[in-house]
UniProtKB/Swiss-Prot annotation:
Residues 25-47, 121-162 are annotated as: Disordered. Disulfide bonds: none annotated. This is FCS-Like Zinc finger 6. GO terms for cellular component: cytoplasm; cytosol; endoplasmic reticulum; nucleus. The gene is FLZ6. The lineage of its organism: Eukaryota, Viridiplantae, Streptophyta, Embryophyta, Tracheophyta. Keywords: Cytoplasm, Endoplasmic reticulum, Metal-binding, Nucleus, Zinc, Zinc-finger. Early expressed in hypocotyl and cotyledon. Later expressed in old or senescing leaves and in pistil, pollen and filament of open flowers.
Amino acid sequence: MLLGKRQRPPINRTTSLSEIKFDLNLPSESEPSNQQKPTVASPYGSNGQAVTAAVDQNRGFLDQRLLSMVTPRGNLRRHSGDFSDAGHFLRSCALCERLLVPGRDIYMYRGDKAFCSSECRQEQMAQDERKEKGKSAAPAKEPAVTAPARAKPGKGRAAAAV
């Protein structure tokens, strides 16, 4: 008997975009084309219409099938690093105020606090725990409201009602 993690079945690969076949009534790849295959910098021409390219997919150029799937707005898929609309809390560490550098790990706490290191994050967690303990201990230390003391006849002492 082996200790540790149990064996898992291998992960089956899904079909990628290059393996999907589309029937778009375009000329087949077997038809002869020009010897010079143009490279296309943009999938749209100057007038906004889609440009069709007869280029070889194996050489890494754009393919007609892929160009026909592009939306007219030109919103091509981008990486998350391309978006500069990051929240203001992702610019600097919430504890030490260092700038958070793109490409480095960011440690999050409570969903809206970003930290440059796990140590800063841990320190903030400790500070929050101290605040929470202080809040929960504060109501117990409050003085109790007392009724005016009444002297019992014959004893001469005042007793406070609690």
